[in-house]
Amino acid sequence: IIESIRAGLVFALKDAVGVDTIHELESGFLARAMKEWGDHPAIQILGSPTAERLSTVSFVVTSPSGRYLHHNVVVAILNDLFGIQVRGGCSCAGPYGHRLLGIDLERSQEFEREIASGCEGIKPGWARVSFNYFISEAVFRYLVDAVSLIADQGYKLVPHYRFSPDTGLWRHESGIVEPPVRLNQMRFDDGGSLTFPRRDDHAPESALADYLAEARALFDSLPDPHAGGEARHVADERLSEDFEHLRWFDLPATSLER
């Protein structure tokens, strides 16, 4: 019943705002983001640049090495450095993903064999960002600038992340961040009300510019891992020859989980 009420409220809100208004706002955000990211030399937007689409942009980021940044490390950096949550993967669109990424049948079968052996991390994919009609101009600029900044210098942070070949997940070297609230911290009081530790810290939108400035300063302070012609390949007994043959993303030696 509760989920039906929530669904009804969603549709009521949509009708109150108006489909035309939603479409106009989202189309405006989408066109501006597509133009800016489309002009960036390290961002490849997937799909037709002219076909009508929803306000979701799927993209991959190239590295100075000639490879790509793994989509999940892009997702991790956006989350950890900017507090932006996006999704990475192939959007449950395997055959279409093959077309978008130019993977032929032979290559697909090679990926399938490696994934079936337990190496989920080799699976190709992309990151995707959505622009909802209700975001402000400041939030829109923050999203666009954060992705552009990662495309500019995100590769510098990759050595500070640990990659799991089994899952394809990347975690910062400092370890897993504790969640704000755990299930075992939630209680029902004597009156039957749910209680839990509250953390209601909120920053104004004016802080977003400061976050971008701090991120730029961090990137500028990091050494370039590709300076001096460092080797692109990783020699590690846990990675098969097939994995190395298929590897399409940067994987510094420091990034392998121990």
Regions found by a protein language model. Name each.
Residues 1-9:
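PLP-dependent aminotransferase class I/II
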Residues 2, 14-25, 29-47, 54-258:
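Non-catalytic terminal extensions of PLP-dependent enzymes
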